[in-house]
Amino acid sequence: MGKSLSHLPLHSNKEDGYDGVTSTDNMRNGLVSSEVHNEDGRNGDVSQFPYVEFTGRDSVTCPTCQGTGRIPRGQENQLVALIPYSDQRLRPRRTKLYVMASVFVCLLLSGLAVFFLFPRSIEVKYIGVKSAYVSYDAEKRTIYLNITNTLNITNNNYYSVEVENITAQVQFSKTVIGKARLNNITNIGPLDMKQIDYTVPTVIAEEMSYMYDFCTLLSIKVHNIVLMMQVTVTTAYFGHSEQISQERYQYVDCGRNTTYQLAQSEYLNVLQPQQ
């Protein structure tokens, strides 16, 4: 038996060896094909599911999470990157600085808005009588006086103010002898002042007809009478209306036409009412 075994052809062992090698190669090829098939299957799965979360040993580095990985070409619009909560880009630097700067800017803008839009006073100053033109009706013993007055209106605001109307009346001996009203006067710009003239026609007659003799008396050069000038100015801004009133006693010459120089104090002599 041993002899017969010793004379067995060697090529059979070689064939067996070749067969073993071939089978091993086939197995390797099968594994490679299986892996390729599995990769194709995974690629197909990825294409079917645009949002995929990779976990475990098969996971790859996220290209947008501080990594350097790559994704297959053509799948840029199919894959969704998962950014971890601990990613530093989710915690921007200088957040406190930006918040403080935003708060400071808001406070600054609010302060400026309050400063410029806060309503300030509108000053009305009665300057005096600018002119007085006199005419007479001898039959009715009536005196007609057209009195032109001057006002200075000052706007202390940082925005324009509209002067809606001026209402004026003149009293003599506690009797109203003339009224006037002017509408839609003018606009006064920010921190500006305008001088406005207005005329009040007055009539002295009836129970005060005795004044006709005084005003036409030739022996007197100056026929001054004391009149109380009342004026109310209505202004408007931002839909809000405000009224400013003034009362002044003023000398007016009823014996002739007179033009007053407002700079001269003698024509601005004012009698204050008794307290």
UniProtKB/Swiss-Prot annotation:
Parts of the chain on the Cytoplasmic side: 2-97
Phenotype caused by lack of the gene: Knockout mice are born at the expected Mendelian ratio and young animals appear phenotypically normal. At 10 weeks of age, knockout mice develop proximal axonal swellings caused by drastically enlarged LAMP1-positive vacuoles (lysosomes/endosomes), increased retrograde axonal transport of lysosomes, and accumulation of lipofuscin and autophagosomes. Giant vacuoles specifically accumulate at the distal end and within the axon initial segment, but not in peripheral nerves or at axon terminals, resulting in an impaired facial-nerve-dependent motor performance.
Keywords, in A-Z order: Cell membrane, Disulfide bond, Endosome, Glycoprotein, Lipoprotein, Lysosome, Membrane, Myristate, Phosphoprotein, Signal-anchor, Transmembrane, Transmembrane helix, Transport
Location of the protein in the cell: Late endosome membrane; Lysosome membrane; Cell membrane
Modified residues (Phosphoserine): S34
Region of interest called Disordered, as start-end residue ranges on this chain: 1-24
A GO MF term: ATPase binding
Expression tissues: Expressed in the brain, in neurons (at protein level). Expressed in the spinal cord (at protein level).
GO CC list: late endosome membrane; lysosomal membrane; lysosome; plasma membrane
Membrane topology, record value: Single-pass type II membrane protein
Glycosylation sites: N146, N152, N165, N184, N257
GO BP terms in the entry: dendrite morphogenesis; lysosomal lumen acidification; lysosomal protein catabolic process; lysosomal transport; lysosome localization; lysosome organization; neuron cellular homeostasis; positive regulation of dendrite development
Disulfide bridge map: C215-C254
Pfam families according to UniProt: TMEM106 (PF07092), TMEM106_N (PF21002)
Main location: membrane
PANTHER family in UniProt: TRANSMEMBRANE PROTEIN 106B (PTHR28556:SF1)
Family that this chain belongs to: Belongs to the TMEM106 family.
Subunit relationships: Can form homomers. Interacts (via N-terminus) with MAP6 (via C-terminus). Interacts (via C-terminus) with the vacuolar-type ATPase subunit ATP6AP1. Interacts (via N-terminus) with AP2M1 and CLTC. Interacts with TMEM106C.
Protein name: Transmembrane protein 106B
Organism: Mus musculus
Highest classification ranks of the organism: Eukaryota, Metazoa, Chordata, Craniata, Vertebrata
Gene label: Tmem106b
